Amino acid sequence: MPISYAVVGASRGIGLEYVRQLATHPDAVVFAIVRNKKGSFHLAAAVANLKNVHVFEADVVDHASMERAAKEVAAISGGKLDVLILNAGRMSGEAVWKGFKDYPNMDALDADCIDAFKINALGVVHGITAFLPLLRAGPTKKIAVLGTDGAIPNTVYALGLPDLSAYSMSKAAAMLATAKWALQLKDEGFTVVTLAPGLVDTTDTVGTSGDPTVKKILQDIDKNHPAFVLETPEQSVKVQLKIVDSLKPADNGGHFRSHPGNQA
């Protein structure tokens, strides 16, 4: 029996790899949601001529566009969806690594944090809200939100990570929003979880493969923080999918890790 997946944030990086791997499953129907369909070159190349992948355009910041995308998915899926994977996030190259001290002024810090919150935190709320009618109509009722151990206070402190300020704070809010949804939906048989992929080198598809600063940051983390192991998207998503496929209602509200190094 076909299993339907919607991957929000599928144009590059981890989301793109989700689509690639899911598309190889003969019983999977994949709905890839991207902010800019014309600009999703890596996705277009990956899914060319694949009949089980459908691409739709929506921005998680714009709840109306997410609702339109959900209706477009429903028109193909018969109004149902089995699994929602929320990967959309704000990862803007070197800027994402900034700590409080790295901003020129408070206005710049405020703007960065607000923008990150809209995408990373409110985007989760918008995504789940839009696809909830389809998930309710389906038998599986799984929601996986991509989180990060970098949003867990004791991990941040133990590893000595004062940077990633806007990203980490907004992802912490996203993980809390996921917990709220897990509570709200538990009596309906849903399984709503956060999933931390660990340290994944996505530079080949996010436009930063030639940025020496980003490469150095990844190498430094890999070297100085042995709790994290730098993985490829293929390695990470392979494990993530095993976790997603094994989820059951008893796992509702959980935080799972796909990477070798658990929290410090």
Task: Tell me the role of every PLM-derived stretch.
Residues 47-64:
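Rossmann-fold cofactor-recognition segment
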Residues 85, 144, 192-195, 205:
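Hydrophobic structural elements of the Rossmann-like NAD(P)H-binding subdomain
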Residues 23-41:
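Conserved glycine-rich Rossmann-like NAD(P)H-binding loop of the short-chain dehydrogenase/reductase
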Residues 61-78:
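Conserved Rossmann-fold cofactor-binding substructure of NAD(P)-dependent oxidoreductases
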Residues 194, 211-264:
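C-terminal helical subdomain
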Residues 90-125, 136-187, 199-202, 209-211:
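Catalytic loop of short-chain dehydrogenase/reductase
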Residues 11, 15-20:
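N-terminal Rossmann NAD(P)H-binding glycine-rich loop of SDR-like oxidoreductase domains
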Residues 34, 191-201:
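Conserved SDR Rossmann-fold cofactor-binding beta-strand/turn motif
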